[in-house]
Amino acid sequence: MRARTLLAAGPMLAAVLVTGCSTTDAGTPISGSTGASTAPGGSTPRSEVDLASTDPCTMLTETEAQQVGVPSPGVRDDVAGFLSCDWQLSARDDPEFDTGMLVSVSIDPERGIEELNLSGAVRITPTTVGSHQGQLVAESGGFGGPGTCQVDLVISPSSHVTVSALTGIDTERACDVATRAAASVEPKLP
């Protein structure tokens, strides 16, 4: 029963973890870099990538998804104006996760991380992943209780990408999964 609840909650979790409002939030905003850099494996400057037309399901390859513990391909699940993709592992597939596991990549081309509503978060820690500054948010409050963690990466002052994980009740494991997934996503970002 808990596994079905977790899997059904995936789209709602993605929306709650990345939904922002106009209130002042806990944490320190971190400004991003505006300089151009070269995309991995190509010569197109990453700053020229149109974030709004990016498919979030291309952010984790099959190998990368397997390395963080979720099957591929991801399932596109745009929620509340965010471009989002979910990768799920059911409890049947891995008995270590009695409630399953969910990893989401959500792209918000119109709001920066300072606009996220993180009131109720247990821990907000500034972080850097590759060349992107951001924040690690443990138990982001609201629907994101124990067993949830997200890494918000600054793309610009008005855009960000959130990589989130839900692992049942183990928040530290969720933060480990979200951090490893963010490290795979980051080189593909502008």
Regions found by a protein language model. Give the residues of each.
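C-terminal motif of bacterial Sec signal peptides marking the signal peptidase cleavage site
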Residues: V16-G20
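Bacterial signal peptide processing site
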Residues: S22-D25
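A short, structure-level motif marking secondary-structure boundaries and short turns
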Residues: R2-A3, P45-E48, P109, L166
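Bacterial N-terminal signal peptides that target proteins for export
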Residues: M1-P11
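A short, solvent-exposed beta-edge/loop patch
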Residues: R123-P190
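Short, solvent-exposed recognition patches
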Residues: P71-V137
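Extracytoplasmic low-complexity, Pro/Thr/Ser/Ala/Gly-rich segments
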Residues: T28-T99
